[in-house]
């Protein structure tokens, strides 16, 4: 499926599917850090990868990739800016740790594991398609480098890519807390998702 050929109806359907998954993911993150976290309604866009990289590329982030296995394969990428990553790690282990440390990386992998599992479970129930997480891997780099690698690993080599992005918000202030959640389906997975909910 050429992403540039997706109709408004198809994009809206993907947004609704992602919204259900994102709500469960926000609940999982809230429970982990003991603070209410909201998420924006997912943005589902067909855009040029170079445009995402140009817009966000220079931000240093901790990025954790969870490969999605099963009927609708792809990648989930959880991104936190460094201060947020450090706060989450400290909240969970009780001491300051760098996201680049072994302990910090391990904590972020566990956070990604729980959040992505919540996201996958809700989508799997909605679509009746099997999804399972792989072992997460965390890296610390410029956001542009992490995004490019993740999209290419999802076999999204084309000029246009499908970007399903959700932003974490502080429930008290409604401000972006510096966290982003991307679901990047492999070629062929989109058709299965749309077909399962009666959209062709």
Predicted regions and their residues:
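Composition-driven recognition of glycine/serine/threonine/acidic- and proline-rich low-complexity segments
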Residues: 2-18, 22-24, 30-200
